[in-house]
Amino acid sequence: MQIDNTVLEKLEKLSHLRIDDSKKEEVMGQLSEILGYIDNLNELNTDHLDAAFSTLKGGTPLREDIPRTENNIARDILSRAPESKDDFFIVPAIIE
């Protein structure tokens, strides 16, 4: 896939970013390199690999799934919020 101005404008809109006109050529080149790298990865034959393949000897260690709450952490985080109520952040509405 070739990155052109049309694709870059669509990416800007989707990401809510604005790329300065002086940087657009550079960004298009970088994105093209990234897509080229992904194309190389897509060409790799991974048929012989198990879907759960791990590079760690013995696999990934499991841990017990025990929920825990530390109320001081939540209180500490909420204390830094501009506005909160009943253990929730209050944010501006984004959908009308």
Swiss-Prot record:
Q: Which catalysed reactions does the entry list for this protein?
A: L-glutamyl-tRNA(Gln) + L-glutamine + ATP + H2O = L-glutaminyl-tRNA(Gln) + L-glutamate + ADP + phosphate + H(+); L-aspartyl-tRNA(Asn) + L-glutamine + ATP + H2O = L-asparaginyl-tRNA(Asn) + L-glutamate + ADP + phosphate + 2 H(+)
What are this entry's molecular-function GO terms?
asparaginyl-tRNA synthase (glutamine-hydrolyzing) activity; ATP binding; glutaminyl-tRNA synthase (glutamine-hydrolyzing) activity
EC number per UniProt: 6.3.5.-
In terms of Gene3D superfamilies, this protein maps to: Glu-tRNAGln amidotransferase C subunit, N-terminal domain
Classification via InterPro entries: Asp/Glu-ADT_sf_sub_c, GatC
UniProt keywords (A-Z) are: ATP-binding, Ligase, Nucleotide-binding, Protein biosynthesis
Q: What does this protein do?
A: Allows the formation of correctly charged Asn-tRNA(Asn) or Gln-tRNA(Gln) through the transamidation of misacylated Asp-tRNA(Asn) or Glu-tRNA(Gln) in organisms which lack either or both of asparaginyl-tRNA or glutaminyl-tRNA synthetases. The reaction takes place in the presence of glutamine and ATP through an activated phospho-Asp-tRNA(Asn) or phospho-Glu-tRNA(Gln).
Protein family: Belongs to the GatC family.
Report quaternary structure and partners: Heterotrimer of A, B and C subunits.
Record's protein name:
Aspartyl/glutamyl-tRNA(Asn/Gln) amidotransferase subunit C
